[in-house]
């Protein structure tokens, strides 16, 4: 398991709320919580930036982290990330914030400590562009959106 430096920015973490941990040995994501001062209603169409009470420093340029929505919030309540996916670069050291967007039709209550998103670490490959005039032809070629069919 890779060690990642974390700063606790909110003293409620480790006291009222646990440090993020993997729920099972097969879990890919760590739950991030809303470390807000008081609960509030996220109105339909509204977006708010929510603090998690943590900052991380990955340090390894071969790793990054992504903040992803929790599937139940999106499917059941229409609550997704305002930026769809949050990318945390290996050299970022600031606070982890979650942009929450209510795309549903009803207000959604967010309480202090609610699990609002998940943090997943992913490998990174930095690419260097090689300028060419033509590509080696493939069966797919330039076929894009919907090109491979429904089945």
Swiss-Prot record:
**One MF term in GO for this entry?**
dUTP diphosphatase activity
Q: Does the keyword Hydrolase apply?
A: yes
Q: Where is substrate bound in this sequence?
A: 70-72, 83, 87-89, 97
Q: Which residues form a coiled coil?
A: none
What processes in GO biological process is this protein linked to? dUMP biosynthetic process; dUTP catabolic process
Q: Which family does it belong to?
A: Belongs to the dUTPase family.
Q: Which reaction does it catalyse?
A: dUTP + H2O = dUMP + diphosphate + H(+)
A Pfam family the protein falls into: dUTPase
Q: What does this protein do?
A: This enzyme is involved in nucleotide metabolism: it produces dUMP, the immediate precursor of thymidine nucleotides and it decreases the intracellular concentration of dUTP so that uracil cannot be incorporated into DNA.
Cofactor dependency: Mg(2+)
Q: In which pathway does it act?
A: Pyrimidine metabolism; dUMP biosynthesis; dUMP from dCTP (dUTP route): step 2/2
List the HAMAP family hit by this protein, alphabetically: dUTPase_bact
Q: What is this protein called?
A: Deoxyuridine 5'-triphosphate nucleotidohydrolase
Q: What is its EC number?
A: 3.6.1.23
Alphabetically ordered keywords of this record: Hydrolase, Magnesium, Metal-binding, Nucleotide metabolism
Where is the secretion signal located?
A: none
